[in-house]
């Protein structure tokens, strides 16, 4: 697996996030910044993806595909950047058609783009609600049995870190709000029609007295099970580059502009 392990959003990253937002009340807001994973502290460098490892028999090593390093960026790259002169190519994501288990929208097709849509729906539900119990409910409904345990799932750990450092117990308190909007995505790897590694870049806004904003990149392996895409990562995926959407750096990191089918 990759050397960089996903970690909960850290307090240290919040200071970076809030540096240009608000100094008054910073002690309270230390829990409200959305941190880039602590592992992403190295100097920016370009990773050239290697070909998938194929053991004897021609089978793809899925763990290698999941852990294949991606472009490493600085934490500040999630907070802003100059718009690119040439916009990135679009990735058209199909619409959901119904509400599925744990009240997460579903009905996405059996395509890599469908897996992108499903992962985004799972991520939006967990991070916008910021509720530990709900995060556990979504994990039970949407993570393949035997895959990443609930206490190691990145989304659960982010919810715990956010609430704990903000002094909230178990869920968002009245007056606080988090919005999560997908802005870009990429299909990192595929192995047949039923298994893919997809990544979603979201625009996250947290409001508690003042508004904070950042970009957050997130990857998972997704497997087609029982007529729907489910999270199937056995462990940590490679750290996804959290880059400000629409920048040259975002394009270099492989992000394609989010486009909803029919719009």
Spans of features found by a protein language model:
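Short charge-dense sequence patches
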Residues: 60-74, 85-91, 148-151, 164-173
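Conserved aromatic-histidine-acidic binding/catalytic patches
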Residues: 11, 20, 107, 127, ...
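Long, positively charged, glycine-interspersed low-complexity recognition regions
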Residues: 2-8, 17-25, 233-263
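Short, mixed-charge, low-aromatic patches
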Residues: 69-79, 92-97, 154-158, 172-179
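Core segments of small alpha/beta cavity-forming domains
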Residues: 86-163
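Structured, amphipathic secondary-structure segments that form assembly/contact surfaces
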Residues: 3-6, 132-219, 224-226, 236, ...
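Short beta-strand edge/turn micro-motifs at domain boundaries
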Residues: 58-60, 64-65, 77-97, 215-246
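Amphipathic, hydrophobic N-terminal targeting peptides for secretion and organelle import
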Residues: 1-85
């Amino acid at each position: 697996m990759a050397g960089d392990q996903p970690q909960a959003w850290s307090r240290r990253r919040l200071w970076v996030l809030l540096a240009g937002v608000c100094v008054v009340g910073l002690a309270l807001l230390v829990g409200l910044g959305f941190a880039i994973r602590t592992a992403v502290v190295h100097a920016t460098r370009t990773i050239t993806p290697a070909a998938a490892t194929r053991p004897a028999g021609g089978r793809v090593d899925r763990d290698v595909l999941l852990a294949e390093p991606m472009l490493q960026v600085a934490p500040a790259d999630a907070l802003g950047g100059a718009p690119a002169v040439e916009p990135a190519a679009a990735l058209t994501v199909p619409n959901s058609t119904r509400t599925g288990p744990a009240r997460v929208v579903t009905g996405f097709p059996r395509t890599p783009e469908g897996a992108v849509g499903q992962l985004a729906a799972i991520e939006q539900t967990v991070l916008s609600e910021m509720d530990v119990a709900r995060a556990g409910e979504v994990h039970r409904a949407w993570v393949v049995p035997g895959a990443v345990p609930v206490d190691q799932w990145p989304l659960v750990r982010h919810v715990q870190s956010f609430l704990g450092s903000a002094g909230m117990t178990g869920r968002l308190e009245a007056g606080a709000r988090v919005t999560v909007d997908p802005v870009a995505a990429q299909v990192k790897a595929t192995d047949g029609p039923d298994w893919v590694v997809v990544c979603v870049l979201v625009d996250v806004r947290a409001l508690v007295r003042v508004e904070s904003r950042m970009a957050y990149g997130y990857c998972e392996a997704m497997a087609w099970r029982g007529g729907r895409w489910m999270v199937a990562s056995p462990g940590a995926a490679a750290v996804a580059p959290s880059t400000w959407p629409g920048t040259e750096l975002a394009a270099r990191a492989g992000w394609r502009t989010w486009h909803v089918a029919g719009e």
